[in-house]
């Protein structure tokens, strides 16, 4: 039976993010890399996550923490908001909201980030991200429709 890709596309996993995670294809755009990284979190593939961090990040140092986070987090969904060009051809940004449940909570939380990607030769890499601030009276980014202060901002 086919499995829908965790990244939120309408494609089957085998035809969407799996080829990137398995190393048989290279993500041609930052949004593809971001979606495949989300799927790697869902699939608990620490090797792909580390390989797709920019080399300057020395991501190997985070391996144990990433592995530990796998047992504490259940990913609930991904919404890509926008993909934007950077200051040069080898820089781009992807804004997204990733919804998740922490093992210590029954509440769905959300991570809203504007991720920065840099290209080295033909490969895109995640380097860092900025989390936009959410006002207490803003709509919660988790998608509940509630105000932030009554939802994830408690």
From Swiss-Prot:
<dbReference type="Pfam" id="PF02810">
    <property type="entry name" value="SEC-C"/>
</dbReference>
<dbReference type="Pfam" id="PF17775">
    <property type="entry name" value="YchJ_M-like"/>
</dbReference>
<dbReference type="InterPro" id="IPR032710">
    <property type="entry name" value="NTF2-like_dom_sf"/>
</dbReference>
<dbReference type="InterPro" id="IPR023006">
    <property type="entry name" value="UPF0225"/>
</dbReference>
<dbReference type="InterPro" id="IPR004027">
    <property type="entry name" value="SEC_C_motif"/>
</dbReference>
<comment type="similarity">
    <text>Belongs to the UPF0225 family.</text>
</comment>
<dbReference type="InterPro" id="IPR048469">
    <property type="entry name" value="YchJ-like_M"/>
</dbReference>
<protein>
    <recommendedName>
        <fullName>UPF0225 protein YE2246</fullName>
    </recommendedName>
</protein>
